[in-house]
Each structure stands twice: as C-alpha cells, then as structure tokens.
Amino acid sequence: MHQLAEELSDYYHLSLRDKLIYKSRIESVPSSTGTYISSESYFISLFVACIILLDIIDIPEKKKFLEGKSTFVASVLPELKAYQRFVNRLIGDGNSTVEESQFQSNCEEVVKVYKYAFETESDEYYERFEISRELKQKCIAASNGHKYY
C-alpha cells in the first residue's frame, strides 16, 4: 500500500504538506490491513489508498467513489507502476511483464471487484476472490484508522 500511495501522491503532484498528511493517514491504517491473508486484504489496501487520497484532493470524487460511480479505478490506477504490479501479481500469473491485452483484462477484473464492493447492493458472493459483502465497510473503517474484522 505504501508504494501505491507514494505513486498516487506523485501522480497528483501533492504539495509537501498534503504528502505528509497523506503519508500520515496511510500509516495510521491498522496493520491488520497489510497482512494479506486473503485476496480481500489486497483489495482493501488498494481501495483505502484511493479513499484517503480522494479525501485530500477531491471530496466530490470521493463521494462518487464510495457510491461506486467513480471512474478512478479504471482511469487513474492503470497509469501507476505499483498498480500494474499489483494487478499482475494478484489477478495475473505473477509475471511482471504481461501483454497489454492481458493487463487490460486484469484491470477490468479489479473494476468488477470495485463495482461489486461499492455499487452493488445484492447479497451475492464474489467467488473468484472470496470477497465479502462487507468490503466497503471494511475499507471505510480502515481509511478512518479503525480496525476491521
């Protein structure tokens, strides 16, 4: 999460003050978020970094993100090297160099997880990554510095 947060702050050219605030908030995320026991933990880390950043730079976009209506995951994240490694490691075969078409397919899968967690209200279970319906609540809790279970 720290590498992704660093790249996001560079991508948005945050001022030194905002970088320090962002880094401090990222560091205040409970350590249980970064244990990566399940694939859900990876997605929590990814989405928490986005929520905290949007809280600093664009509150209306953060609101859209939390409602599942943002294009942030599809448009901004693929520009970042840390995200590319994340996607290729979690969804792909672990190879850091995959074809562009495979990378796009992997990114679409992350967008599906985002939509499942933040937009959909159904009780269905996202089987591919064993993601619970409480993913959104866990992300919000972690981004506010609270532990989630």
Where are these regions (language model features)?
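The feature marks long, low-complexity, polar/acidic/proline-rich intrinsically disordered regions embedded
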Residues: 2-149
